[in-house]
Amino acid sequence: MKSALPSIFTLVIIAEFIIGNLSNGFIVLINCIDWVSKRELSSVDKLLIILAISRIGLIWEILVSWFLALHYLAIFVSGTGLRIMIFSWIVSNHFNLWLATILSIFYLLKIASFSSPAFLYLKWRVNKVILLILLGTLVFLFLNLIQINMHIKDWLDRYERNTTWNFSMSDFETFSVSVKFTMTMFSLTPFTVAFISFLLLIFSLQKHLQKMQLNYKGHRDPKTKVHTNALKIVISFLLFYASFFLCVLXSWISELYQNTVIYMLCETIGVFYPSSHSFLLILGNAKLRQAFLLVAAKVWAKR
């Protein structure tokens, strides 16, 4: 049974790979069709396109890394191969996390209501704010790449002195853990920002509901519904990313103790985040949801 586990986990990852490519590809396709037909596209739709493309890249990177780790482990001690695999993961994961966080900030600035002059200033210039944040995240990306490159250089310097390349797997796993730790520390910033956006959206919704009660209005007014939908999208991102973060932590421990089964399980669960969260974005967006239901109805009718 234990020998069959790698094959089972591989099948699950392939299924997640297919779901992720279909859901993210659907987001890109529908928005691009709308862009061509209307000659314009809203800021949130542009964010969704870039986020979906980054997730497609991340899913492909995870799948390639998975198969290389199972069948061509020697590539990870090659200087060029090691840098390509790790840097591609860093870049795709960086844009995946930060674009989802920027989407949370966009919902906050567009939907929430606060009387603070600073908030109103940002709200009136939301498109410029989003662009500046996106450009500012490149600083984190470059710092992350520099730090990881130092880890890689130290690793290669140690083992280039060993002409036989008979390295210890425990040493390589220690190197892998240090790399994952660095990447995760850089990932905490977007998660924290998204969590703050979530709390501010809740506070704004609470104030809005209190105002509606004072005016003797129901809770199903349009603004309440918009608040609720935005909260669902942000909290789904937080929950999915929290599970992804826990899987990374567990994979660290499993690598240190050389527990292959736990490591593969954590990696498989971790892929669920970029693969499935985009499907929730489709359901939370009126245009994408309508297009999805239309396609699903046509597919069902042909059965």
Curated annotation (Swiss-Prot):
Record topological domains on the Cytoplasmic side: 29-55, 107-128, 206-232, 283-303
Function: Receptor that may play a role in the perception of bitterness and is gustducin-linked. May play a role in sensing the chemical composition of the gastrointestinal content. The activity of this receptor may stimulate alpha gustducin, mediate PLC-beta-2 activation and lead to the gating of TRPM5.
Glycosylation sites: N162, N166
Other known facts: Most taste cells may be activated by a limited number of bitter compounds; individual taste cells can discriminate among bitter stimuli.
GO cellular component: membrane; plasma membrane
Record SUPFAM superfamilies: Family A G protein-coupled receptor-like (SSF81321)
Protein name per its UniProtKB record: Taste receptor type 2 member 13
Keywords: G-protein coupled receptor, Glycoprotein, Membrane, Receptor, Sensory transduction, Taste, Transducer, Transmembrane, Transmembrane helix
Lineage: Eukaryota, Metazoa, Chordata, Craniata, Vertebrata
Similarity remark: Belongs to the G-protein coupled receptor T2R family.
GO biological process: detection of chemical stimulus involved in sensory perception of bitter taste
Residues exposed to the Extracellular side: 1-7, 77-85, 150-184, 254-261
Superkingdom classification of source: Eukaryota
Organism whose genome encodes this protein: Gorilla gorilla gorilla (Western lowland gorilla)
